[in-house]
Amino acid sequence: MTEAFICDAIRTPIGRLGGALAGVRADDLAAIPLRTLVERNAKVDWAALDDCMLGCANQAGEDNRNVARMAVLLAGLPETVPGATVNRLCGSGLDAVGSAARAIRSGDAALMLAGDRKSVV
C-alpha cells in the first residue's frame, strides 16, 4: 500500500466574529492558501493534481455551492482539477484530509490537496 504524506501546510489568518474577514467570500478565503501552496511548490506538476477536498460546514448563501471547486479555480489551478466539498460539521476538514490520504493509500490518487475552510461571520 502506498504511503500518504503531508508535504506542506498553510492556514488563513485567524479572525473574530464580525471582524475584518467577515465580508470575505468563503471561496475567496479558501483560495488564498491554495494559491500560496502552488507558489511555494513551483516544481509540482499541478496539472497532475487528482483532486482538492475541502471541508466546509453549514454551506449557505454564497457558500451554497462547491466551495472546493470554486477555490481551485480562484487559486489559478488548472481547470482539469476537480474539487470536492465535505460537510461533516465540525469534522469536515479532518474528514477531507482523511479521505485524501485514503485515496492515495488505496492507489486511487497520487497527488491531493486537502484541508478546511471555516468562516465565522
Kindly give the residue locations of the regions a language model identified:
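Short, well-ordered amphipathic alpha-helical segments that serve as non-catalytic structural scaffolds
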Residues: A26-A42, V67-A71, A96
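Signal peptide-proximal N-terminal region
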Residues: R35-A48, G76-E79
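Condensing-enzyme catalytic core mediating Claisen C-C bond formation in acyl metabolism
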Residues: M1-V24, T36
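Conserved small/polar residues in nucleotide/adenosyl-binding loops
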Residues: K118-V121
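General beta-strand structural signal in soluble alpha/beta enzymes
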Residues: I6-C7, L54, P82, L113-G115
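Conserved catalytic cysteine-centered active-site region
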Residues: V24, C56-A110
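Short glycine-rich phosphate-binding loop at a beta-alpha junction
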Residues: A47-G55
